[in-house]
Amino acid sequence: MERLLIVNADDFGLSKGQNYGIIEACRNGIVTSTTALVNGQAIDHAVQLSRDEPSLAIGMHFVLTMGKPLTAMPGLTRDGVLGKWIWQLAEEDALPLEEITQELASQYLRFIELFGRKPTHLDSHHHVHMFPQIFPIVVRFAAEEGIALRIDRQPLSNSGDLPANLRSSQGFSSAFYGEEISEALFLQVLDDASHRGDLSLEVMCHPAFIDNTIRQSAYCFPRLTELEVLTSASLKYAIAERGYRLGSYLNV
């Protein structure tokens, strides 16, 4: 039985090196989809590159942990910028949910202004959309706008309460990440999904060329290793051999 595989590269717009890596992994590899940071420092560069790569499906990478928000968010920003203190606020049940709702809508409209179309799907930087307080907001928004949503079902206990019209892949994996990136790891992710019986699977990845912005990231050189693996001809063959068809959230 043929299965759908979505290979989504996060962080489109983070930096030029990230953008070039994603385009390379699409053009000469197995990346079929990406998600864009509309407040990223290289988002205009990402938009420009995407015009020459119409086969690349582009979704929105909702940002609440980096850079400047598009709306006033006094309850979440410090000195006008977003940061990882969102985890502390979540633990204290002190997230400004109305501000987050407004920021989601603003980033969505900004995406449409930049790319001239709706995003294929929605996910988030550092998976913040899976926070229990934020998840219902994002689910409702995606369902209303008719766009798909990345759902990590492992931490999710209320998946049965999702709207009937909400589209997502049956499976999602963030396991292709870390210091031990290899073709074998990627194929293990596929085999695990097959054993679960998932008929559609999204695999998250972060292929990039190294630039000064990426050097400042805690996750730096493995991005280049990811790029090497994702553009391997043998990996593409092994994926097809396992009965997977490459696609995007447009196929869900």
UniProtKB/Swiss-Prot annotation:
It is found in: Cytoplasm. InterPro entries: COD_ChbG_bac (IPR022948), Glyco_hydro/deAcase_b/a-brl (IPR011330), YdjC-like (IPR006879). Disulfide bonds: none annotated. GO terms for biological process: chitin catabolic process; diacetylchitobiose catabolic process; polysaccharide catabolic process. GO terms for molecular function: chitin disaccharide deacetylase activity; deacetylase activity; metal ion binding. The keyword Transmembrane helix does not apply. Pathway: Glycan degradation; chitin degradation. It catalyses: N,N'-diacetylchitobiose + H2O = N-acetyl-beta-D-glucosaminyl-(1->4)-D-glucosamine + acetate; diacetylchitobiose-6'-phosphate + H2O = N'-monoacetylchitobiose-6'-phosphate + acetate. Its EC number is 3.5.1.105. Keywords: Carbohydrate metabolism, Chitin degradation, Cytoplasm, Hydrolase, Magnesium, Metal-binding, Polysaccharide degradation. Involved in the degradation of chitin. ChbG is essential for growth on the acetylated chitooligosaccharides chitobiose and chitotriose but is dispensable for growth on cellobiose and chitosan dimer, the deacetylated form of chitobiose. Deacetylation of chitobiose-6-P and chitotriose-6-P is necessary for both the activation of the chb promoter by the regulatory protein ChbR and the hydrolysis of phosphorylated beta-glucosides by the phospho-beta-glucosidase ChbF. Belongs to the YdjC deacetylase family. ChbG subfamily. This is Chitooligosaccharide deacetylase. The lineage of its organism: Bacteria, Pseudomonadati, Pseudomonadota, Gammaproteobacteria, Enterobacterales.
